[in-house]
C-alpha cells in the first residue's frame, strides 16, 4: 500500500520496546460526496471508522468488523480499494519505556444504506461515538479547533485530519494544538532559550499576518512556533535546518517543513547561513537544491523577518538582533543584513504600520523548558 506520510513524534528512546497495533480504517464516501465518519460528542472531533486488526484477521475482515461496531454500517466488500497507509510512532504513555507503533491502512469503500445498532466498547461509549456524514474539509476544520489535552488522542486526531486534507487535495497543516504539542515535545528533548525565541517569533508573526488581509494569522503563528523545530535533536548549527525540514516533511506537513528550511535563508543562498556547517556535503547540496526550487511567498518572508527580531526575552529592533548575532558569531553577511531591512520595509508597507508597533512585545510567553 502507498505510504501517505509517517507521523513519528520521535519522543522516545532508541532502546524502548515497540508495541505494534496495526489498524484498518475506512474512507466511506456517500452519493452526495460526504464521508461517513465517527464523531466524538464528548471531545468534538471526527475520526475515520476503523481500528485494530486482531490476530488471525486479514485487513479487510478487520475493516468490516470495526466499521460495523463503530457505525452500524455494513461495508460492501467488493467496493474495498487500497487508499494509503500512515505509520504512527510516539512514546507510549501507558507503559514505561515503550513506543506505540501503529501502521494504519486506509481503504476507500462504500456501505449499505441500512444502519444497525453500534457495538461500542467502554472507551468509545465514554467518548460519545456516533455516525455522522460530513464533507472532508468540514471535518478537518472541526478537528483543528479541537483542544483535547491527551497527547495520544491529539496525535490520532492530527493523523486523521491530515488524511482528510490529502483526500481533499490539500497539503496538510498542523493545528495550533498539534504545533504546541510538537514544540513542547521538542523542548523536552532539548531544553533551551530557543523555545522562548520560537514563541516570540510565532506571536509577532500572528500579529503582523492579522494586519495583512491575504495572510492567515493562525497559519503564521503555527509556522513561527515550528520554524526552529529541528533544535529538538540537539545543540546544532545548519543541522537544525536540515533536521527540522525532514521531521515535518515526513509528517506530511510540507508547508511547515518549508518554513523550517527557508527561515534561515532570506536570499535563498546557503552561504548566508550564520553558524556551524555541521551536516555532510550531500545534505548541504540537498538544502541548496530545495531552496533553488522554492519561490518565496509572504509566509517565508514573514517568518524570516520575525525570526530576525525575536530574541529569547522578547521582540527587539532588527539592528539590535543582527548585531547580537554578529557579536556571537563574528560576522553577518551584508547582503543578508540588507535583505532583512528590505523585509521590514516590505511588511510595513503592506500593513501601513510601523513594524515594532505591529509585532508588539507582549508578556513573556509560557515556556516548558529551561535555558
Which residue stretches match the model-derived regions?
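Conserved Nudix-box catalytic region and its N-terminal flanking loop in Nudix hydrolases
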Residues: 30-70, 74
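Charged phosphate-binding loop/patch that engages nucleotide di/tri-phosphates or the phosphate backbone
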Residues: 147-174, 331-371
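Nudix hydrolase/Nudix homology domain
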Residues: 45, 116-177
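Active-site flanking loop/helix segments enriched in acidic
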Residues: 18, 176-197, 226-232, 266, ...
Amino acid at each position: 500500500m502507498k505510504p501517505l506520510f509517517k507521523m513519528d513524534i520521535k519522543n522516545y528512546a532508541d532502546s524502548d520496546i515497540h508495541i505494534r497495533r496495526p489498524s484498518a480504517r475506512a474512507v466511506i464516501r456517500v452519493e452526495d460526496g460526504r464521508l461517513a465518519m465517527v464523531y466524538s460528542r464528548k471531545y468534538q472531533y471526527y475520526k475515520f471508522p476503523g481500528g485494530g486488526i486482531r490476530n488471525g484477521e486479514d485487513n479487510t475482515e478487520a475493516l468490516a468488523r470495526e466499521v460495523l461496531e463503530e457505525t452500524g454500517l455494513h461495508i460492501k466488500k467488493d467496493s474495498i480499494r487500497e487508499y494509503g497507509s500512515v505509520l504512527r510512532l510516539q512514546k507510549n504513555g501507558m507503559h514505561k519505556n515503550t513506543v506505540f507503533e501503529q501502521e494504519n491502512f486506509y481503504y476507500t469503500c462504500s456501505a449499505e444504506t441500512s444502519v444497525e445498532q453500534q457495538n461500542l466498547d467502554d472507551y468509545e461509549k465514554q467518548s460519545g461515538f456516533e455516525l455522522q456524514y460530513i464533507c472532508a474539509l468540514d471535518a478537518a476544520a472541526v478537528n483543528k479547533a479541537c483542544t483535547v489535552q491527551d497527547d495520544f488522542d491529539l496525535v490520532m486526531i492530527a493523523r486523521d485530519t491530515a488524511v482528510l486534507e490529502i483526500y481533499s487535495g490539500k497539503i496538510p497543516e498542523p493545528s495550533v494544538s498539534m504545533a504546541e504539542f510538537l514544540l513542547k515535545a521538542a523542548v523536552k528533548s532539548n531544553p533551551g532559550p530557543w523555545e522562548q525565541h520560537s514563541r516570540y517569533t510565532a506571536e509577532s508573526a500572528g500579529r503582523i499576518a492579522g494586519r495583512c488581509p491575504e495572510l492567515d494569522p493562525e497559519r503564521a503563528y503555527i509556522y513561527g512556533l515550528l520554524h526552529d523545530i529541528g533544535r529538538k535533536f540537539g545543540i546544532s548549527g545548519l543541522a537544525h535546518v536540515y533536521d527540522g525540514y525532514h521531521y515535518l516533511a515526513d509528517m506530511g506537513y510540507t508547508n511547515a517543513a518549508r518554513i523550517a528550511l527557508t527561515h534561515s535563508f532570506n536570499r535563498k543562498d546557503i552561504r548566508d547561513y550564520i553558524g556551524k556547517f555541521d551536516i555532510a556535503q550531500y545534505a548541504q547540496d540537498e538544502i541548496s537544491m530545495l531552496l533553488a526550487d522554492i519561490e518565496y511567498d509572504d509566509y517565508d518572508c514573514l517568518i524570516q523577518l520575525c525570526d530576525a527580531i525575536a530574541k529569547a526575552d522578547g521582540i527587539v529592533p532588527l539592528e539590535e538582533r543582527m548585531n547580537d548575532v554578529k557579536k556571537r558569531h563574528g560576522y553577518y553577511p551584508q547582503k543578508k543584513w540588507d535583505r532583512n531591512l528590505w523585509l521590514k520595509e516590505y511588511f510595513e508597507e503592506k500593513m501601513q504600520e510601523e513594524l515594532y508597533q505591529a509585532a508588539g512585545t507582549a508578556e513573556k510567553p509560557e515556556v516548558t523548558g529551561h535555558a
